[in-house]
Amino acid sequence: LDNIPKHMQDAVIASEDRRFYDHWGLSLRSVARAIGINILSLSYRQGFSTLTQQLARNLYKTIGFEDSILRKIKEVITAVQIERTYTKDEILEMYLNTVHFGHGTYGVEAATKRFYGKESKELSVDESALLVGLLPSPASYSPIRHPDRARKRRNTVLRLMRDQGYISHNEHAQYRAMTLEAVNELPMRGKAPYFTEYVRRLLEKEDEALDI
């Protein structure tokens, strides 16, 4: 976790789970809000996943990703077990190293190299906010395919960071004005660059097909 910038950690918590350090794997406030929305809409529209629940899905694929109450129950049970076993910092580190950022990348380090061509420790605040903005739907907010959407989503993350005290109003205005500098195509490395590129493109097609 020491190699991941503090502002990246802050951006994830501000955007994905603001009560991360206060709950035990399940946020009762989020559950109550989600239940209210689902009852009013007479359907399953609002989820209530904490960071730990998201990690549970990432680590244990048998939990599944479908929108159902059964999946949520399995997810919550696994999340509570994770919270009992690991510290909050360990959970955050595992999450950041396994979460999907789109374009065939998993984890902050791989995503930073894919979009910016550098190491995660070199990320600026606005760059971290853009990467975190991808998490709800990497295909929809891809800075390569949908730069306008990506910028708006990045600004939403920056606003959340400002509102929760992670950055000042002046910093928010400064970072919000930054243009996107995503790297479209990185030079291929390794002994089989064309095969690697072929696999990467297959993964990107899967992302688009699943809208993730």
PLM segments and residue spans:
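A short N-terminal beta-strand-loop micro-motif at the entrance of redox/enzyme domains
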Residues: L1-P5, I82-R84
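Flexible, acidic/glycine-enriched loop-and-adjacent beta/alpha segments
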Residues: N3-L51, E109, Y116
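Non-catalytic, structured segments within soluble enzyme domains
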Residues: S43-I212
